[in-house]
Amino acid sequence: MAVALETERVLSGYNEALSGAVVYRVPDPGYLRIAGADQIAFVQRQTTNDVQALASGRALLTVLTSPTARILDVWRLVVEPDGSLGAITLPGRGAATARFLQSHIFFMDKVTVTDASAAWAQVEVFGPAASSVLTQIGLAQAPAPDAIVSWDVGDVPVRAFGTGQGCLLLVSSEQIEGVEGRLNAVGAVPLSQEAYEVLRVEAGRPGPAHELTDEYTPLEADLDAAISDRKGCYTGQEVIARQITYDKVARRLAGLRLDALVTVGAAVQVEGRTVGAITSAVQSPRHGPIALAVIRRPHHAPGTAVAVADAAGAVSSVTVALPF
């Protein structure tokens, strides 16, 4: 009975995301404050995008990379009301990223890095009716992608970040329950993590525990939009510059339609040779068994027949363009 109820709950949230509006509480959210006279220069030399282009009222996507250009974290970077910088990190990365940045502050740097993750909750609101439910709790107009709008829900300050699929709300962790309650009251349905993962994979979005890791570079994980090819030096730039200039991105994120569900980490093969690995896999109510994989070029191209070497045996599959 419990398994059936759980399945029904997951499907209900999934269906509501396609036809109405859902609310998803981001687990273990991360938020950093970066302040000081050298805050821009400090972040500029650590991440991939041009931080000097950051403007008030806008968010900038940028990637913290290692010397070999592997992904350490992905941020939405914003200007705080007091002029400092705020960085929304990947879930679960706030504390580790704060320590990493603090260890990279030089003695002459006039900058501080504070882990403020515990103070802020993050909630995603999306679905065809998302704009309607947000309007009903006082938002005049949903923000465009990368735009930021601030307003009060009752006496609770809320910031909404446009994501393209809906909004990410940043709310005091002490007051989030009341805001979620208001959203539920006007028709936004809570979404489970299981349903969120299915929707994420269907949309072809890389996830923090799967594709956005130090196994991959930003270009391999479809983060081209977070890279500036006109800015000065930053950690990992030489590798990324070679990938761009000489078309040396050896692997790319791809979608797979499968004959059966497979496990994360299973090898993707062509004629018995491993060309990639499964990074996310779900059973979609709309599409059946599907997966995301990082696959060597040119085998990532849509329409390529591949086999997935799962524990139970080889599973036939074909690559598809994203989103599904």
Regions found by a protein language model. Name each.
Residues 36, 87, 125-127, 169, ...:
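Residue-level signal for inorganic ion chemistry
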Residues 216, 221-237, 241-324:
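Glycine-rich, small/acidic residue-mixed loop/short-helix segments
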Residues 70-71, 83, 156, 273-274, ...:
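Short acidic/polar mixed-charge low-complexity motifs
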